[in-house]
Each structure stands twice: as C-alpha cells, then as structure tokens.
C-alpha cells in the first residue's frame, strides 16, 4: 500500500515561530494529470519540511529586525509638567539616557530627567529600517517550499513598522486650534448656545399684566385648567408666563399700587374725564396693605383716663393749700 501522500503534522521550528515576519502563507497548487499521491488526506495538501537553507534565511531576517529595533533613537523629552494647571512646560531633556542595563526596568527610564522612554520623541533610522516588500524567495515561513517550484506562489504579510510615538501637545495649542475651528465655522456652536429671548406684543403684555393682577402675581393657587386656557388665548406657554410674572412682579406691581406723583397730578388736572372703573381686586389689595383702623373704645378709654388724672391732680392741689394755711395759723 502506498502511503506516501498521508503525512502527519510537521513540527514547527522555533526560529520560524519566533520570527516577527511570519505571515500568512498561501499555496496555489496546479496539478497536472490525475489525482496521484500528491494530494493529502481529506483533500489537504501537505508541505515538505523546511530545508536548512530556508532556516538560515529566516534567522538572518530575525537579525535584521533586531538591528532595526536597535536603530531607533529617542530624542528630547515631550512630557508636559504643567498640564495640571493648564500650561505647557518641558524639563529640557535633549536625549533619552537609559538608567540601567538593557532588559531591566530601569532601562526604560531616563537617567537625566527621570521620565519614561515613551515621553521622548522616537526617531527611526531610515537606513536601518527593514524593507516593507520582499520576494517570496527571501522570506520563507512555516511550510514553505524550496526554490525552484514554479507552480507555487507565496504571499507573505510582512510585519508592519511600529506605530509612531504620540506627540504630547500642550494645552495652549489645543485651545488655539479649538478657537480657530470655532472662528472658521461662523454660526456654529456659539450661535447654538445663545439663549433664545421671547418677544411679546403690546396686547400680550397688557393681557398678561391684567391676569397677573387678578391672580395676585402667583400661579400656585390657581387650577391648571384656568392657566392653560389663558395661555392658549394669549399664545404663550405656562413656563414663559411664569417667568414673565417673576421678572415683572417687583416693577409693574409696585408701579400700579404706588403711582408716581406726576401721574397723580395729571389725574387731578383731568377733571372732565370720568373716573376709572374701580377694580375690586385692586381695592382688596389696597385694603390689605393699609394698616387697620384703631377701635373707638380705645379713644374713649384714653379720654377717661386723662380726665381722672386731671381731677386727682386738682384734689391734691387743694389739700396742699389747706395744709399750708394751717401751718401759718
């Protein structure tokens, strides 16, 4: 029995597994002729083991990647020490100096400024950077085929370069950019945040003033149906009416209860005009504000007390005169 096509799982080489350039490997097999022993079990195509030459090339690729990592240099420190107070201040460190041996935790901290290495600007050496595109015969991953197979096309995903270091922007720059954006967009957020002011007509003001005087400048004691009906008639909302009454309570109410002297003089001069119709609600408010009159019994009691005091003083005067005459005799 021919078992040449049934091959087990191949072991994964350590050097190939550790390589950062190990990507997806797709093999497109073009078979000519009938299905021979080249097809694996269950329709799978098994790849031959990696030859020594390919392993050497993989090791060489790993060395190049390590040298590219070592080529990165960290320049000036960008840590903002005044971010808590909204300012921008750096320590002036010009280049990262490791504080310990390579591989230790102290190696990630700068011995000059004491900041972490990530705060320093990262600079990559363009000459030592690994190329982004390789041919299929330069990088061979797990299960790759040796050179000379014209029927296999290898597509490798090369590991991308490390992401660029995030620049720490000062708060002043960020605020400036935001203000520039706001200035570049007229009618944007500033107009949206502007409070809308309600404008009333003269008729609405007169009707709201009369309603406020009738209810005593308060809406708590009224039924909601009455207030809602009035708001629908005037064309304002309940909240708007309440705010208007609160804003004009100390001005319009006092003006109507205590008119100015000029207005009173004008009313006196206009004798021919008929007197205005008295408002019962206004009369009640005026009566409540006036002090209560003193009772008549209090006046009578005070007059009686004064008369009794005068009579007692006259009696004492007579007694004093009699005593004086007796002493002289």
UniProtKB/Swiss-Prot annotation:
* Matching PROSITE patterns: ZF_HD_DIMER
Pfam families, per database record:
ZF-HD_dimer
Keywords of this entry: DNA-binding, Homeobox, Metal-binding, Nucleus, Transcription, Transcription regulation, Zinc, Zinc-finger
Span of zinc fingers (ZF-HD dimerization-type): 74-123
Q: Where is this site: Required for DNA-binding?
A: 245
- Chief place of localization: nucleus
- InterPro entries under this entry? Homeodomain-like_sf (IPR009057), Homeodomain_ZF_HD (IPR006455), ZF_HD_homeobox_Cys/His_dimer (IPR006456)
GO annotations under biological process? Answer: regulation of DNA-templated transcription
Q: Where is this region: Disordered?
A: 24-58, 252-298
Q: Where does it localize?
A: Nucleus
Key word Transcription regulation present:
yes
Query: Which stretches hold the DNA-binding feature?
Result: 193-256
What is the role of the protein in this entry?
Answer: Putative transcription factor.
* Record text about domains: The homeodomain differs form the typical one by having namely 4 instead of 3 extra amino acids inserted in the loop between helix 1 and helix 2.
The entry describes its oligomerization and partners as: Homo- and heterodimer with other ZFHD proteins.
Q: What is this protein called?
A: Zinc-finger homeodomain protein 3
